[in-house]
């Protein structure tokens, strides 16, 4: 009996050991899963915090972009007024130069009249001496002398009246010159004020750009910038499409009118005669005839180094749809051909943009401008200044972004440029 009981007691120990070991393994497993869950929660919390930070920075960036737009629009307006003031000042200087020349001429005339008057007075005096002798010698000669004296008296009176008139003219010119100089002083004061205002705005803009650059470095550069570039391009296309739609009726009407002129020319040729279009009709046909085949016939919008070419890699799979030309800030941007302005506005990524329609689905686009010199609906001629080079849209240096679009699609603009 005793031998039978002992083995049963010894058999329980391995079971207990196995149970304890199994429980330990399970506890370790539960502990590991708990650690993983905690780690996952921590990672998720970090991700959520980073997402909130990114959203906050994006909101700050959007706010700064809005401020950047206002600053650049204000600089554009200040630059335009500065240019107008300078033009007015140049005109006043020209008027003052003309008045000075007129005064000098009048002074010369006055001196000549005074010399002539002195000669006449001397002649009259000499005639008076001869008249005394003639009174003794002959009564008839005496009468002749009296007539000569009367003649010289009238002549002297006329000379005195001329001198008085010249003096009056000189006083009037002096008054006008004083008035012009006063206006010039006012213009100079306004010019100084505007320059100070522009300097203040430029400083504020530079500060905004620095803040914007700091935010950009804290946001993911790759996909974020790629998405933004796509959005900028989409906004540009939409803005152009809206501008085209708004100008469509006028463009179609002008195209019909231009075709009517061409039909009249053809009809005249068929009849063996000629039809000479008016200047207005010539301008109409020129600005609605499109850019034609690229043969280097168009004006360069601005002269300078090409910083980016059409088709170069921009970001990821995105390519430049136009070209970027470096130039000094304030350089005149010229229309490449005749046309009509359909867009002059600030667009994110492109700054202040001017778009000119040339007819037959062709248009040219000018971006990054400091100031626009034309407005929507303006007719422009080839080589006419339409904007001033700038760095709007947050660009790092003054330059011009230039595109040519044909039937809504961006094409390589380089082959058209040559003049």
Swiss-Prot record:
Changing residue 405 to H: Loss of activation of amidases; does not complement double envC-nlpD disruption, protein localizes normally. Residues 252-290 are annotated as: Disordered. Its main location: periplasm. The keyword Ribonucleoprotein does not apply. Keywords: Cell cycle, Cell division, Coiled coil, Periplasm, Signal. Changing residue 401 to E: Partially unstable, loss of AmiA and AmiB activation; does not complement double envC-nlpD disruption, protein localizes normally. Changing residue 321 to A: Retains AmiA and AmiB activation. GO terms for cellular component: cell division site; outer membrane-bounded periplasmic space; periplasmic space; plasma membrane. Residues 35-124, 155-271 form a coiled coil. InterPro entries: Cell_wall_metabolism_enzyme, Dup_hybrid_motif, Peptidase_M23. Transmembrane segments: none annotated. It is found in: Periplasm. Residues 252-270 have a biased composition (Basic and acidic residues). Pfam families: Peptidase_M23. Changing residue 366 to H: Partially unstable, loss of AmiA and AmiB activation. Belongs to the peptidase M23B family. This is Murein hydrolase activator EnvC. It comes from Escherichia coli (strain K12).
């Amino acid at each position: 009996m005793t031998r039978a009981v002992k083995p049963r007691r010894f058999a329980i120990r391995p079971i207990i050991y196995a149970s304890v070991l199994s429980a330990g393994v399970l506890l370790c497993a539960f502990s590991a899963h708990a650690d993983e869950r905690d780690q996952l929660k921590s990672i998720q919390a970090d991700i959520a915090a980073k997402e909130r930070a990114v959203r906050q920075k994006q909101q700050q960036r959007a706010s700064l972009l809005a401020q950047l737009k206002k600053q650049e629009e204000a600089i554009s307006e200040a630059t335009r007024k500065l240019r107008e003031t300078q033009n007015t000042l140049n005109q006043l200087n020209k008027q003052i130069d003309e008045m000075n020349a007129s005064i000098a001429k009048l002074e010369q005339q006055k001196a000549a009249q005074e010399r002539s008057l002195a000669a006449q007075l001397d002649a009259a005096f000499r005639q008076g001496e001869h008249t005394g002798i003639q009174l003794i010698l002959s009564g008839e000669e005496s009468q002749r002398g009296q007539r000569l004296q009367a003649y010289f008296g009238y002549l002297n009176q006329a000379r005195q009246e001329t001198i008085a008139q010249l003096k009056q003219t000189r006083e009037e010119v002096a008054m006008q010159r004083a008035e012009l100089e006063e206006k010039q002083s006012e213009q100079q004061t306004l010019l100084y004020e505007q320059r100070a205002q522009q300097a203040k705005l430029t400083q504020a803009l530079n500060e905004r750009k620095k803040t914007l650059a700091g935010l950009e470095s804290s946001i993911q550069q790759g996909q974020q910038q790629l998405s933004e570039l796509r959005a900028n391009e989409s906004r540009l296309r939409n803005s152009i499409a809206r501008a085209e739609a708004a100008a469509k009726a006028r463009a179609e009407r002008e195209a019909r009118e231009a075709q009517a002129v061409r039909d009249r020319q053809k009809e005249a040729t068929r009849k063996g005669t000629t039809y000479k279009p008016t200047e207005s009709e010539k301008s109409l046909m020129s600005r609605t005839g499109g850019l034609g085949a690229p043969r280097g016939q168009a004006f360069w919008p601005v002269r300078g180094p090409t910083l980016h070419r059409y088709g170069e890699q921009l970001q990821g799979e995105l390519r430049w749809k136009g070209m970027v030309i470096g130039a000094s800030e304030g350089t005149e941007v010229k229309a490449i051909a005749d046309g009509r302005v359909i867009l002059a506005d600030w667009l994110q990524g492109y700054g202040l943009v001017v778009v000119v329609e040339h007819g037959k689905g062709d248009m040219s686009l000018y971006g990054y401008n400091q100031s626009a010199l034309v407005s929507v609906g303006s007719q422009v001629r080839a080589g006419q200044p339409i904007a001033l080079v700038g760095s709007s849209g947050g660009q790092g240096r003054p330059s011009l972004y230039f595109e040519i679009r044909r039937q809504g699609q961006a094409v390589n603009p380089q082959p058209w440029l040559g003049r």
